[in-house]
Each structure stands twice: as structure tokens, then as C-alpha cells.
């Protein structure tokens, strides 16, 4: 159920907030064993939050904007008093001593926390297969992955186990699973939402954002969690607009740029290409002007990302040494031996792989050839976007080259797995807002996502375009049966 449907239930007195929240837990208890979208649920706290909202309703008091909306949180975002594991053996028993800014703003806005969702370990992956708590399944086909790293968040929304979820996006980790699961996923401008309380992966790329059933729900959450934060020096001190104001504005005359390089890439699945191009035709029928643009270095984004992100990860994850917190090995005759064993036993294969890549890229004699060169290419990618936005208002691409793949397909082929992020990483490298919306299905019945990229702090523009498309695209409003 989306926010508006839930509000109708509440305001018409068909159900109390407590009853609605309890219904979600009943569904989770009965069905999440098939999906494994949650690492843990927080039923007692959720019921208490729901009762508080019910009291406000009974007393005819003004309700906060997200009053009674059941929301799940990706388990790399700190929630005070609740385990924040990053789906890793390293933090399996870590309980956060403070609340992240983003989740704190959600609860202040009346949102209700249902629990913490599964992810790839430390958010490093594209399939949610590397979690120490097990693989998450795609509700559209439980033999397939939900995408990653926010796969648990996307799967929980698609399965109806929450009304919305919060994820993090470093190279596509909100948008790619949103595409695979047939829901909406928004990565805001870098700095639009505070990263305080988000366990760091790659600090110049990470961003928190919503995964929802509808574009308007994403706009509501973005409005609630955005804004300056004294705890995050990278958080922008810019006014936060009401993203709902212009959602229904006509897009007649909107200039949408079709990035030529994306549609010519040999890895793009023909069914995905056909569906997204049909979406382009729909935008044109709605009054948008379609313009082909070139971003010559767009496809260099994936190689650039897989130097920069592991480099930053190797520095950020150096703190997990078994001394202050996190997993500590019982073996080791001295500090160095204990630290080495703690990291070897605490981190999974993919995390260790990325730490090694990053350490190598930053090492003496190689940083010029790899890390510094990647930063130069990153600047060129941003310049390509700058040039494109001189001609158009919004850019359009497929979200992913393919639909959801089978579990295990790329477990032993990390390079092919990395290509899942081919079309999403450039927006992270440039710090731009981007949204994935459903645009159709392939012949197997699997969802296909369409990505809209906006200029810096122009979330309102991509939300408007996405919402008009969503309203028009009645044919794709299906839900998975599992």
C-alpha cells in the first residue's frame, strides 16, 4: 500500500494505525521466510509509535506529515538501541548508540520503524547475496536476486512488507534494486541528505534515499529527510523545497536528453532497450521534447568507480580491527596477528576483495596510475553532464542493462556483477540526483526500470517528470505474487 491508501484507511476510521502496523507484521511473519528481506523487526517499538499516533488522532491534534507510515531501514543506517550489522560478521552484534539524522527525521515526521532490511555486506554488491544473514529473494521470482546493495529494502517494498524503505546508494544501490523489484528508487544530490549515521563505504559517493511504491511517496520522504545537518560537513546548507508542489505540473516542453552511449552499449539487453525506448515515446506523447545527447565518457564511469569506491572503502574500513568494536578473533598471539585474523574472519570475500583493490590503487607507486587518474576521469564525466544540461533539462537512460538475474549467476564472476552498475554509477561520480521508475516488463514477467538524471539539486524536476510518467503508465501497475 502507498501512503495515500494508508491515509484513507486511517482517516476514514477503517483501521487504527496500530491495527495497520500489526497487519504488516502479520504479513512479514507469514511470508518473509520466502524473501528474507528483513534482518530484524522492531515490533514492540513500532506498536508503541503507532499508539502515539492513534492518541493524536483521537485528540484531534495536528498530525506530522508521515504520521503512521510504516517504514523499513537498510541495516547500514544507525538506529539507536537496535542492531546495525551491515550484514557482516564484523558487526553482527553491534548495537548503534545513536540515531542517524535521516532516520531521526523520519520518526520526527511520524514515520514508524518496522525493522532493518538485508543488504550486501557493507553495501558492497549488486545482488544482496553476500549478507551473513543469507540471500534475499526477488518477490517477482524467488529464484532471482532483488538487486543490491539495498536489495532487502526494495524487496520489502515490492512484497508489501512495508509502505516504504530507506536505502543507501553509492553506485546504484537504491536504483538498481528498485529496477529489479519494480518499485521507485531515488538517489538525491550528494549532500542533500545527511550521511550522519550511515556506515561509510565510499564517503564521496554514498547517499541516503527512499525506495517506495510511488513517486509521490518518494517526494514525501525526501522532503522529510533533507536539509542541513551540523553533524555532516558535506551536507548542503540549501533550502528544502516542498517536492510535492510541482509533482503534477505539465511536462509539455520539458527537454529530455537520451544519452546516445547508453543505448549503443553491447551489454544492453534488447528487451530492456525496447521497453525504455517505449517509455521515451510515452514521454514524447506527454509533451516532452526528446533530444539525443552525447556523454563520451559515460561508459568510462564503471572503471572509474571501481577504482575510487574501493580506495575509499579501504580507508573507511581500516577502523574495523577487533580492538575498539566489531568482531574480534579468539586467536592471535599478538596485536598484529589478532587484527589480521579478526579482519580475515570478520569480512566476507567481496569486502576483502574491494579492500585489496583499494589498498593497491592507493599504494606508493600506483596511486598516480590508478586513483589520481580515476579522479581526473571523474572530473571529465562531470563536465560531460554539465555540457549535456546546457541542452536539456533531464537525462534518460535504462536503469540497468538487464532484468533481475538468477541467484548464483555471478558469484564467481565479479566483473560481470560489477557491470550491473554500468548505467547508475555516473550519477554518483557527478553527485547528481537520479530516480528509477518502472517502465515495463520483459517476456519472463520481470520488471524493467527507466532512469531519469537531473542537474544538481533539481530533484523536483525529475520527480515531476517521473510522476507524470507514472500516472500515465497504468499498464505497469502490477504487484508480484509469491
Curated annotation (Swiss-Prot):
* Keyword terms, alphabetized: ATP-binding, Ligase, Nucleotide-binding, Protein biosynthesis
For this UniProt entry, the molecular function terms from Gene Ontology, in alphabetical order, are: ATP binding; glutaminyl-tRNA synthase (glutamine-hydrolyzing) activity
- What is this enzyme's EC? 6.3.5.7
Please indicate if the UniProt record lists Nucleus as a keyword: no
Which enzyme class, named as a word?
ligase
Catalytic residues (positions): 74, 149, 173
**Is-annotated flag, keyword Nuclease?**
no
Which pairs of positions does the record mark as disulfide bonds?
Answer: none
Q: Which Gene3D superfamilies match?
A: Amidase signature (AS) domain
Q: Which NCBIfam families match?
A: gatA
Per its UniProt record, what PANTHER family does this chain match?
GLUTAMYL-TRNA(GLN) AMIDOTRANSFERASE SUBUNIT A (PTHR11895:SF151), TRANSAMIDASE (PTHR11895)
What this chain does, per the record? Allows the formation of correctly charged Gln-tRNA(Gln) through the transamidation of misacylated Glu-tRNA(Gln) in organisms which lack glutaminyl-tRNA synthetase. The reaction takes place in the presence of glutamine and ATP through an activated gamma-phospho-Glu-tRNA(Gln).
Protein name listed in UniProt: Glutamyl-tRNA(Gln) amidotransferase subunit A
Q: Whose protein is this, by species?
A: Prochlorococcus marinus (strain AS9601)
Encoding gene per record: gatA
Amino acid at each position: 500500500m502507498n501512503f495515500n491508501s494508508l491515509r484513507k484507511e486511517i482517516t476514514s476510521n477503517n483501521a487504527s494505525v496500530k491495527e495497520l502496523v500489526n497487519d504488516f507484521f502479520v504479513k512479514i511473519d507469514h511470508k518473509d521466510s520466502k524473501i528474507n528481506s528483513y534482518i530484524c523487526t522492531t515490533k514492540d517499538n513500532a506498536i508503541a509509535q503507532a499508539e502515539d499516533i492513534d492518541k493524536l488522532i483521537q485528540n484531534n491534534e495536528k498530525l506530522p506529515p508521515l504520521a503512521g507510515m510504516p517504514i523499513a531501514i537498510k541495516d547500514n543506517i544507525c538506529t539507536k538501541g537496535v542492531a546495525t550489522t551491515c550484514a557482516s560478521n564484523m558487526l553482527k552484534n553491534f548495537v548503534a548508540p545513536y540515531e542517524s539524522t535521516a532516520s531521526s527525521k523520519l520518526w520526527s515526521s511520524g514515520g514508524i520503524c518496522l525493522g532493518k532490511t538485508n543488504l550486501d555486506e557493507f553495501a558492497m554488491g549488486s545482488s544482496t547475496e553476500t549478507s551473513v544473514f543469507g540471500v534475499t529473494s526477488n518477490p517477482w521470482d524467488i529464484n532471482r536476486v532483488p538487486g543490491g546493495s539495498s536489495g532487502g529494502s526494495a524487496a520489502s517494498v515490492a512484497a508489501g512488507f512495508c509502505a516504504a524503505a530507506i536505502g543507501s546508494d553509492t553506485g546504484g544501490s537504491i536504483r538498481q534494486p528498485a529496477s529489479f523489484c519494480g518499485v521507485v528508487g531515488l538517489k538525491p544530490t550528494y549532500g542533500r541528505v545527511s550521511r550522519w549515521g550511515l556506515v561509510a563505504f565510499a564517503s564521496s559517493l554514498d547517499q541516503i534515499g527512499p525506495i517506495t511504491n510511488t513517486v509521490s511517496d518518494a517526494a514525501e520522504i525526501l522532503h522529510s529527510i533533507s536539509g542541513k545537518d551540523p553533524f555532516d560537513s558535506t551536507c548542503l546548507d540549501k533550502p528544502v523545497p516542498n517536492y510535492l508542489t510541482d509533482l503534477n505540473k505539465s511536462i509539455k516542453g520539458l527537454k529530455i536528453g537520451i544519452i546516445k552511449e547508453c543505448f549503443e552499449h553491447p551489454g544492453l539487453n534488447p528487451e530492456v532497450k525496447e521497453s525504455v525506448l517505449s517509455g521515451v515515446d510515452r514521454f514524447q506523447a506527454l509533451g516532452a521534447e526528446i533530444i539525443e545527447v552525447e556523454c563520451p565518457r559515460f561508459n568510462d564511469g564503471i572503471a572509474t568507480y571501481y577504482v575510487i569506491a574501493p580506495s575509499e572503502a579501504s580507508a573507511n574500513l581500516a577502523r574495523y580491527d577487533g580492538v575498539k568494536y566489531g568482531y574480534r578473533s579468539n586467536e592471535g598471539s599478538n596485536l598484529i596477528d589478532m587484527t589480521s585474523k579478526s579482519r580475515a574472519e570478520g569480512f566476507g570475500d567481496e569486502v576483502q576483495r574491494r579492500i585489496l583493490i583499494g589498498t593497491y590503487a592507493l599504494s606508493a607507486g600506483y596511486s598516480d596510475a590508478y586513483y589520481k587518474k580515476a579522479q581526473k576521469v571523474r572530473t571529465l564525466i562531470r563536465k560531460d553532464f554539465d555540457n549535456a544540461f546546457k541542452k536539456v533539462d533531464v537525462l534518460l537512460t535504462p536503469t540497468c542493462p538487464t532484468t533481475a538475474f538468477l541467484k548464483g549467476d555471478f558469484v564467481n564472476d565479479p566483473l560481470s556483477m560489477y557491470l550491473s552498475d554500468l548505467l547508475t554509477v555516473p550519477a554518483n561520480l557527478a553527485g547528481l540526483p537520479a530516480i528509477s521508475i518502472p517502465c515495463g516488463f520483459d517476456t519472463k514477467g520481470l520488471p524493467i526500470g527507466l532512469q531519469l538524471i537531473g542537474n544538481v539539486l533539481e530533484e523536483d524536476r525529475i520527480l515531476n517528470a517521473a510522476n507524470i510518467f507514472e500516472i500515465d503508465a497504468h499498464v505497469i501497475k502490477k504487484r508480484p505474487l509469491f
